[in-house]
Amino acid sequence: MASEAPPFWWEEPDWKVLALSPLSAVYALVAGRVMRRARREKIEAPVLCVGNFTVGGTGKTPVAIALAQQAKRMQLKPGFLSRGHGGSFAEPHVVDAHHDAAKHVGDEPLLLAEHAPVAVTPNRAAGARLLMAKHGCDFLIMDDGFQSARIHIDYALIVVDARYGIGNGRVIPGGPLRAKIVDQLVFTSGLLKMGEGTAADAVVRQAARAGRPIFEARAEPISKAGLAGKRFLAFAGIGHPDKFFDTVREAGGEVVLSKPFPDHHFYAEDELAELAAVARAEGLGLITTAKDAARLRHGASQDFLNRLEVLEIDTVFELDHAPERIIEETLDAWRQRKLRS
């Protein structure tokens, strides 16, 4: 199931925002109350949540992967908790990166599963117990679920895209916010500003005034080799496809044609056939994101996959010690929780 944020969410407020204000006010009231009153189950392992304030992509999954890699360097055994966008399992399911399809577990869990065990379930606490019992995980990283998960979070790292910030600053449906910033900041442990830009400056200052530590990071291609001088038809079904197109250019590729699709889009045969035909006619290579490639593994022909280049992304923190600090502060909060119980 694909989703696409309305363009006006990322623009200056207009009449549409005004018309939706009553609904936004109701949504904000309910969302804030849910966050404040939710019963969150405490589990035996520390829980680090990588979330965001808004609907849409902010680069959480590469951040979660980077933190899992840091946890491994600290001799921990990380595991991921994910709802799994579009997933179809009623009970907690541990993802098999080689055999599971994105339509069953979601695209992001397939990427996460290449680095650590992943439990897909809306019941994060049940998923946590499964990972601890069957895989010996002793450090759990939750990809999303900041506002809704019914599990105690020891550290909530909120990722904000520097290019888009929090959009028009309004709550759903008038804007991209999942709840009022003041309500979300209460449960925020730290804020990570991703990339370059000034759109997030206001919320960064607000978080800093609230005493939350501010981290910075950027997304970098894992390998730029082979892209320089190549001409591409780039396509992507992610939160902000234009960010991907820019990354291809920054890596040395020439984006001659670009085709955006809705976030989490599952490609139909005729769409893939059209992409391949246009690329062939124009003498272009095909390039897409790792998330899109995960969705295509069980849906595209082998010929299409053989022609496709995938741009892998890594999260690079501005301060080398930042990931270690985040892990340590999660562990400290967990130890304090254990002492109080």
Swiss-Prot record:
It is an enzyme of class 2 (transferase). The gene is lpxK. ATP binds at residues 54-61. The lineage of its organism: Bacteria, Pseudomonadati, Pseudomonadota, Alphaproteobacteria, Hyphomicrobiales. Pathway: Glycolipid biosynthesis; lipid IV(A) biosynthesis; lipid IV(A) from (3R)-3-hydroxytetradecanoyl-[acyl-carrier-protein] and UDP-N-acetyl-alpha-D-glucosamine: step 6/6. It holds the Pfam family LpxK. Belongs to the LpxK family. It comes from the Bacteria. The keyword Transmembrane helix does not apply. It catalyses: a lipid A disaccharide + ATP = a lipid IVA + ADP + H(+). One of its GO terms (cellular component) is plasma membrane. SUPFAM superfamilies: P-loop containing nucleoside triphosphate hydrolases. GO terms for biological process: lipid A biosynthetic process; lipopolysaccharide core region biosynthetic process. NCBIfam families: lpxK (TIGR00682). InterPro entries: LpxK (IPR003758), P-loop_NTPase (IPR027417). Its EC number is 2.7.1.130. GO terms for molecular function: ATP binding; tetraacyldisaccharide 4'-kinase activity. Keywords: ATP-binding, Kinase, Lipid A biosynthesis, Lipid biosynthesis, Lipid metabolism, Nucleotide-binding, Transferase. Transfers the gamma-phosphate of ATP to the 4'-position of a tetraacyldisaccharide 1-phosphate intermediate (termed DS-1-P) to form tetraacyldisaccharide 1,4'-bis-phosphate (lipid IVA). This is Tetraacyldisaccharide 4'-kinase.
